[in-house]
């Protein structure tokens, strides 16, 4: 049975093709960060306040857990947390209706304790969060209705967080978003696009930290001070195929970069998101492509210039940002 909610609809800007998902129920999300304190649904002992687990990392104690993935109660895509079949969509749509925004939208609850920062999560448990995400992405890679998937985090009110309890979100889309199309197109003209990114960062002293064969670097054109990317040195298109050493490295580096940012700008809000290639059932694996995690501090708001031109302004150069992050 489908959801009783109207399904989300996807509209496109007629001049640029930019997609916009209309999901009115998103306005119903709890807003604990605005001061309306509620019983936290993500804390241990409150599991009945969330949908059932999709996946879970168990704790050593019987019945306990360290991290869990559940359906998002206020999804951007897939109104009931699942992809709807073509027959359902055709039968329900009135003439001229915008296409439904199919997909899956889930919440990754990263700790049973009520903590606000990933820095409060023990390193082994934090690595387990990334392993849980890898497992779920591997499941979605086998679903031919999901073209592409990501994990993203909103940390702090300025980054769009609505609940304090540490968590991230996992989304699978039935289409490939424009930013990934643009990255694939830009990389198609280079024999080794990500290798060039790493080499340039080494030459220009923009490497912040390394672990295993992963590097954390400040990109040459950061959108905000201290923007950092984490990526492997050698090609790997899909995060769910990464080996255990790389998984441990991305966990260690993500905590390291957030810790460095927090020491430079205490309690700084930030977003991050995982970029990987579209799943192979949707498009052939791109040659010499690298999944990468982009960490974007939210230190300056976007104003008319940025929104009207698509250009960003930063107050710290890439090289200076890397030096400050290394020094903390």
Map each language-model feature to its residues:
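Gly/Ser/Thr-rich active-site loops/lids in small-molecule metabolic enzymes
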Residues: 240, 244-253
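Active-site microenvironments that recognize anionic phosphate/pyrophosphate groups
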Residues: 1-165, 171-238, 245, 258-263, ...
């Amino acid at each position: 049975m489908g959801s009783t909610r109207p399904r989300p609809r996807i509209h496109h800007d007629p001049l640029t093709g930019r997609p916009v998902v209309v999901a009115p129920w998103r306005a119903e999300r709890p807003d604990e960060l605005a001061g309306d304190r509620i019983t936290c649904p993500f804390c241990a002992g409150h599991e009945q306040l969330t949908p059932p687990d999709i996946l879970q990392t168990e704790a050593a104690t019987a019945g306990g857990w360290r991290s869990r993935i559940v359906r998002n109660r206020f999804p951007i895509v897939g109104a009931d947390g699942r992809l709807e079949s073509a027959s359902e969509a055709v039968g329900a749509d009135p003439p001229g209706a915008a296409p439904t925004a199919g997909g899956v939208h889930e919440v990754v609850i990263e700790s049973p304790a009520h903590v606000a920062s990933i820095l409060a999560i023990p390193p082994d448990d934090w690595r387990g969060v990334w392993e849980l995400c890898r497992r779920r992405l591997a499941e979605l890679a086998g679903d031919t209705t999901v073209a592409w998937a990501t994990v993203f985090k909103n940390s702090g009110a300025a980054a769009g967080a609505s609940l304090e309890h540490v968590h991230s979100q996992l989304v699978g889309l039935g289409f490939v978003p424009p930013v990934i199309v643009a990255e694939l197109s830009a990389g198609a003209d280079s024999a080794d696009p990500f290798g060039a990114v790493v080499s340039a960062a080494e030459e220009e002293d923009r490497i912040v930290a390394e672990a295993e064969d992963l590097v954390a670097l400040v990109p040459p054109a950061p959108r905000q001070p201290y923007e950092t990317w984490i990526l492997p040195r050698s090609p790997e298109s899909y995060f769910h195929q990464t080996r255990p050493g790389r998984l441990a490295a991305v966990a260690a580096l993500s905590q390291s970069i957030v810790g460095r940012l927090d020491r430079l700008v205490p309690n700084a809000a930030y977003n991050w998101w995982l970029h990987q290639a579209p799943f192979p059932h949707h498009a052939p694996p791109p040659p010499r492509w690298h999944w990468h995690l982009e960490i974007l501090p939210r230190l300056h708001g976007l104003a008319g210039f940025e929104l009207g031109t698509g250009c960003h302004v930063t107050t710290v150069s890439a090289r200076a940002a890397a030096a400050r992050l290394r020094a903390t």
